[in-house]
Amino acid sequence: MQKKRFEQQGEKTMPMIRAEFLTGKTQEQKRELVEALTRETARVLGVREQSVWVVLQEVEPENWAVAGTPLSER
């Protein structure tokens, strides 16, 4: 079972989750996101929550484009 494999690695397994999103989220939303990502990553991978790292990256709409158009122009 894959979960046991991760458990056997112990502290050597330190998953890092990166979440990128547009600016404008509240501190509460970001806190809830970090908690949920941490909890679910630990559950699925079978590691301790203390070993999960989460990095949030807020991006300005002019720096994020879809189909060649910055979101600030949509």
Please report, for each region that a protein language model flagged, where it lies by residue:
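Short, Lys/Arg-enriched N-terminal segments with co-localized hydrophobic residues
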Residues: 1-13
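Residues in and immediately flanking transmembrane alpha helices
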Residues: 2, 31-33, 71
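Low-complexity intrinsically disordered segments
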Residues: 10-11, 23, 66
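Amphipathic, hydrophobic secondary-structure cores in small proteins
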Residues: 16, 21-53
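C-terminal structural segments of small proteins and small subunits
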Residues: 43-71
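A charged helix-plus-loop insertion that forms the helical arch/lid used to bind
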Residues: 74
